[in-house]
């Protein structure tokens, strides 16, 4: 019976839409434009502990559509999930929160973003799949580079690292 309490546990407690905003600063005139918009997508992932063995993981997507120099729409959504994670080795916890949890909640966010764009009167934007493992590795590399850049230990008044 004691062995059961030490079994690794990864369980979804809840998936929810934490934040969703839509801006159409140039409507209704933007609907008269014939040109196809350019689409920019930004992604961010976060996680935080809520209680012992309970974590919140978030994926934030910002979609900006522009026609010429005018913003057609800007949609930002943050999908979150609460996960119970127990008896996972420490070296596996960060990748689980940065890769596994986002893989679970991202499909919900994709659907919510597409729905908001369609309801705003625009053609749907279908967000592609995201390889969160590659995204996680890129974040680790950026963090390592940032730490290497700040290795002098001297921080300037503006928060930047001193350069030699």
Swiss-Prot record:
Q: What is its main location?
A: cytoplasm
Q: Tell whether Secreted is among the UniProt keywords.
A: no
GO annotations under biological process? protein folding; protein tetramerization; protein transport
Task: State the Pfam families in the record.
Answer: SecB
GO CC terms? cytoplasm
**GO molecular function, a single term:** unfolded protein binding
Spell out the subcellular localization from the entry.
Answer: Cytoplasm
Q: Which UniProt keywords apply?
A: Chaperone, Cytoplasm, Protein transport, Translocation, Transport
- Assembly and interactions? Homotetramer, a dimer of dimers. One homotetramer interacts with 1 SecA dimer.
HAMAP family referenced in this protein's UniProt entry, alphabetically: SecB (MF_00821)
Note the PANTHER family from the entry.
PROTEIN-EXPORT PROTEIN SECB, PTHR36918
The family line of this record is: Belongs to the SecB family.
Name the job this protein performs: One of the proteins required for the normal export of preproteins out of the cell cytoplasm. It is a molecular chaperone that binds to a subset of precursor proteins, maintaining them in a translocation-competent state. It also specifically binds to its receptor SecA.
Protein name, UniProt field: Protein-export protein SecB
- Organism the protein comes from: Janthinobacterium sp. (strain Marseille)
